Amino acid sequence: MFRKYFLFTTCFYLSLFSVAQIDETKVETVQKFDEVLTYINRLYVDSVDDKKLTDAAIVALLEKLDPHSTYISKEEVDEANSSIMGSFVGIGVRFQILKDTLMVVATIPGGPSEKIGILPGDKIVRIENENVAGVGLKNNQVREKLMGELGTKVKIEILRKKAKKPLNFVITRDHIPINSVDSYYMITPEIGYIKLNSFSRTSQDEVQKGINFLKDKGMKHLIFDLQGNGGGLLDAAQRLADEFLSGEKLIVYSEGRAQPRNNLNAGKKGLWESGSLILLTDEYAASASEILSGAIQDWDRGMIVGRRTYGKGLVQRPIDLTDGSQIRLTTARYYTPSGRFIQKPYDNLEAYEDDLNIRFKNGEFSHADSIKLPDSLKYQTNITKRTVYGGGGIMPDIFVPIDTSASTDYFSDLIQGGHLTSFSLEYVDKNRDAIFAKYATFDEFKKNFTIDKKFMDEFLAYVEKEDKELKFNEEQFKTSEGLLKLRMKAVLAQDLWGYSEFYQIYNDSNEILQRAIEVIQKGEYEKTNLDRKN
């Protein structure tokens, strides 16, 4: 066993050095590493797991390079790729384990479960004749049972309200889309909104669908929400930027020691090359989000509203290893069209990992002037010659401070403890028919449904029963009551209709979005003349 991993490790290191001629020093380095492994295997006091030892060595090696070069084991490769590929193989349900019972929250539109007749509220009690109710299964264990090879079948047994006996279904596993667009809708008769959560293979198609829908509704201004979007595929960012930029404008370029400069340009006619455009960013928007934001800002195509982005601008190249595992190795840096370097400094890895906390403590999230940047980091946009800044992340054109006035520890405990989610599931399960009878459409629900005192009392009683350690805090409850009610209504809408409807309600508390709406409605955007510069 050791011999196999000994050879694999040797091949791994030699493959890294095969790009250039291996000099004597590098040969000695490889030999030294193999020598250490040999002595460990022969002399160490206890037996060792060769695979784990090799994996740990690779992880430690990559950690010395930069924060984003990583090792992915063979077992994790498919899972790591599924989100950026935009799909996985399964039965197409969104589920929640509620009181040790597997409840279907929603079926994926067009997926195998929807096609065969699975309904929201159904309780899955058996999978392949194995009991899954009341046995303490975790989410990952359920996923393993429901996911599988394309075209294979899985038998499930469900309990359904008003059904006299359990119902049996045989579902054929299929490709299930992982949507990168959470929501798109008209905020006002002229302002459209799209929320993008990641950059995947399907992002362009999803965004195009959203833009076409909104244009048909009369959209004149587009707000494109990148808050919390940690990135994804570079070519997805390029294709989305091409929807907004005309001609063959440079979108981003990359350059590294072993990689010459590589330009990525726009090239086709996009769906929204004219018309107002505002991108929303925050400290969690990273990588591909920053590439898109930087291109839009540098070409004066639109405005950035929010807070400084994360600052991840390193190119990771996936390299498959012989045993099926993978490394993602940093090979270049990203630069915006004006030449700004997106990546924030990482000389001090401990400070790098704690960067957001440091920025918060320094007041950056509350005050725009807390960020002190030298003149050397000043750049100019390509059209209007506005001043923009490099040095890590994309600085917004309009800063929006974080609002923590309604957020309390008690509110956070309710959210993080999953109490809103579990109570909502129970409430919807008991009252689904009555809710739909009273509110035939989402618009009616949004306009007329309210969280009254009776509802809130039931919720607080539920929390008290389910979580003995969480003590009611009246002062903090009153501080957060308005936000809590809004969140409750949004979660109910999500369980009844979907993610898009969640955002249509909860976005009322989104300060960055509300500021962007104000920028449009008060004429601030029009005064910039950005629409007439492209």
Write out the residue ranges for each language-model feature.
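Conserved functional hotspot residues or short segments at active or partner-binding sites
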Residues: 341-342, 346-534
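Bacterial Sec-dependent N-terminal signal peptides
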Residues: 1-26
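Polar, glycine-rich mid-to-C-terminal structural blocks
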Residues: 288, 300, 307, 311-379
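Generic structural signal for buried aliphatic residues
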Residues: 124-125, 154, 342, 388
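Extended, small/polar residue-biased N-terminal targeting/export presequences
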Residues: 34, 44-105, 151-183, 506-517, ...
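Residue-level recognition of conserved beta-strand edge/terminus positions
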Residues: 127-128, 159, 330, 345, ...
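Cleft-lining beta-strand/loop regions that shape enzyme active-site pockets
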Residues: 20-29, 33, 37-50, 73, ...
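A sequence-level detector of short linear motifs
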Residues: 133, 168, 328, 343, ...
